[in-house]
């Protein structure tokens, strides 16, 4: 516990029992969800709000807590603390946990109880670091699952579709953290997403997506090529658009930053040894593999403006999106076949070795031969009245629609100014003329 004084006044999480009253608990916040609103069944036309979090006071004991109330109270309470803070909760209601129903959407905990906070009776206080024993603070670096209970990124890729929809644990290093992107849904709800690229000794780049504000805030604190994370209970899916496996942070997920476990120390040494040399040469561009909402792209550019924008943003990780009215000035489909189409593994979706026609990822530890399929990889030039963009990448479904053939998504070119075509169709001359006149998006 925090200290001898704290040990006398706080109830440990291991001692919690239903219907206990007038108690105080202390713990480190190891997980937290966003505030959500739901229609109030008792008051038609109004909403009730809720959020939940998970606290821990020892290596073996942690519990979920939730609070319901009006919008102002819930948002104020949620904003008062973050993951990593130590909190004191006074007068929570102790209820028995409905394991099967609640752990479907909440983190699995060893306790049979849960805490319910009410506006009228419960309080939450954030402790300053000097008030708390370092043993309690150190719990933030201890995963909630066994240190060996995880998949390597290479294992996930190798298993492919067999892990689709599964909830698993992942230990990996942070390669990059994308900027949060905000959007509004068709029913006018605001949302956000952030993509984190992970890597380890077995895989050079793997996408993990955060959809809630709490996990995005946590991700923004990570240092690329320095931070290691243990992500407990992330959902794994095969992304048909990207043709690869991806991870998603869900409401069950608890992410431990820089976990204090031997496996993480080994990975950390790997990061340090390869930080400067960057020997991982099979990198897949993360932004090209993101799902892009074309309806949100409204800025119109000329070739000259795009080149100027590229020079201005040189060195920045985020891509730029825009509309270009141009004609295809080079479409070299008469080139060697190997430069127009590539073979991909039907299991993991990665490009296979051209000489052996075998996937080194899936077949290196298996006698089962994995089939391959053809994938477009066409480089085109786009030209307008201001200049030409050379070696633009025309791949995937866009290439299929443009060329009238049916292959699937391929990697894009890796050198020079990189342009990816997200949509390609005939432009109305009047519309093109109107948009090209007086546009300034540099």
UniProtKB/Swiss-Prot annotation:
Gene3D superfamilies the record matches: Nucleic acid-binding proteins (2.40.50.140)
GO cellular component: chromosome; cytoplasm; nucleus
Keyword flag Hydrolase: yes
Keywords: Chromosome, Cytoplasm, Disease variant, DNA-binding, Exonuclease, Hydrolase, Meiosis, Nuclease, Nucleus, Premature ovarian failure
Enzyme class: hydrolase
Tissue expression per record: In fetal gonads, specifically expressed in the ovary starting at the 14th weeks post fertilization. In the adult, restricted to testis.
Any single biological process term in GO: double-strand break repair via homologous recombination
InterPro entries, per the entry: MEIOB, NA-bd_OB-fold, OB_MEIOB_N
Subcellular locations according to the entry: Cytoplasm; Nucleus; Chromosome
DNA-binding region(s), residue ranges: 167-272
Signal sequence coordinates: none
Disulphide bridges: none
Its EC number(s): 3.1.-.-
GO MF assignments: chromatin binding; single-stranded DNA 3'-5' DNA exonuclease activity; single-stranded DNA binding
CDD domains hit by this protein: RPA1_DBD_B
Short name of one Pfam family: OB_MEIOB_N
Keyword Iron-sulfur set for record: no
Family: Belongs to the MEIOB family.
Subunit structure: Component of a multiprotein complex with RPA2 and SPATA22. Interacts with SPATA22. Interacts with the complex BRME1:HSF2BP:BRCA2.
Associated disease: Spermatogenic failure 22: An infertility disorder caused by spermatogenesis defects that result in non-obstructive azoospermia.
Role noted for this protein: Single-stranded DNA-binding protein required for homologous recombination in meiosis I. Required for double strand breaks (DSBs) repair and crossover formation and promotion of faithful and complete synapsis. Not required for the initial loading of recombinases but required to maintain a proper number of RAD51 and DMC1 foci after the zygotene stage. May act by ensuring the stabilization of recombinases, which is required for successful homology search and meiotic recombination. Displays Single-stranded DNA 3'-5' exonuclease activity in vitro.
UniProt protein name: Meiosis-specific with OB domain-containing protein
Species of the source: Homo sapiens (Human)
């Amino acid at each position: 516990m925090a200290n001898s004084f704290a040990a006398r006044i706080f109830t440990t999480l291991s001692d919690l029992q239903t219907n206990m009253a007038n108690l105080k608990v202390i713990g480190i916040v190891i997980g937290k969800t966003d505030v959500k609103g739901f229609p109030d069944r008792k008051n038609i036309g109004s909403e009730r709000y809720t959020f939940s979090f998970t606290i821990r006071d020892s290596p073996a004991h942690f519990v979920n807590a939730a609070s319901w109330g009006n919008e102002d109270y819930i948002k104020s309470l949620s904003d008062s603390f973050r993951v990593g803070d130590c909190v004191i909760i006074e007068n929570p209601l102790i209820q028995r946990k409905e394991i099967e129903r609640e752990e479907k959407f909440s983190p699995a905990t060893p306790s049979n109880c849960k805490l319910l906070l009410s506006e009228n009776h419960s309080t939450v206080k954030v402790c300053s670091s000097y008030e708390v024993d370092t043993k309690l603070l150190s719990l933030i670096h201890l995963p909630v699952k066994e240190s060996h209970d995880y998949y390597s990124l290479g294992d996930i890729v190798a298993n492919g579709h067999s892990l689709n929809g599964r909830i698993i644990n992942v230990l990996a290093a942070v390669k990059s953290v994308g900027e949060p992107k905000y959007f509004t849904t068709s029913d006018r709800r605001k949302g956000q997403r952030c993509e984190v690229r992970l890597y380890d000794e077995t895989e050079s780049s793997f996408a993990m997506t955060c959809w809630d504000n709490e996990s995005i805030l946590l991700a923004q604190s990570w240092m690329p090529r320095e931070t290691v994370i243990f992500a407990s209970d992330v959902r794994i899916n095969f992304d048909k658009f990207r043709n690869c496996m991806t991870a998603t942070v869900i409401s069950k997920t608890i992410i431990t930053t820089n976990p204090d476990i031997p496996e993480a120390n080994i990975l950390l040494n790997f990061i340090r040894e390869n930080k400067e040399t960057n020997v991982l040469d099979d990198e897949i561009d993360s932004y090209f593999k993101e799902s892009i909402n074309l309806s949100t792209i409204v800025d119109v550019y000329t070739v000259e403006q795009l080149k100027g924008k590229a020079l201005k943003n040189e060195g920045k990780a985020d891509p730029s999106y825009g509309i270009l009215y141009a004609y295809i000035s080079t479409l070299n489909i008469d080139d060697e076949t190997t430069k127009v189409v590539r073979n991909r593994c039907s299991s993991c979706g990665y490009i296979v070795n051209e000489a052996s026609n075998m996937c080194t990822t899936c077949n290196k530890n298996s006698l089962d031969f994995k089939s391959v399929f053809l994938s477009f990889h066409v480089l085109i030039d786009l030209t307008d009245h201001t200049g030409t963009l050379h070696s633009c990448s025309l791949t995937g479904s866009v290439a299929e629609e443009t060329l009238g053939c049916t292959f699937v998504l391929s990697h894009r070119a890796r050198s020079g100014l990189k342009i990816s075509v997200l949509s390609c169709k005939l432009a109305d001359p009047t519309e093109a003329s109107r948009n090209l006149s007086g546009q300034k998006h540099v």
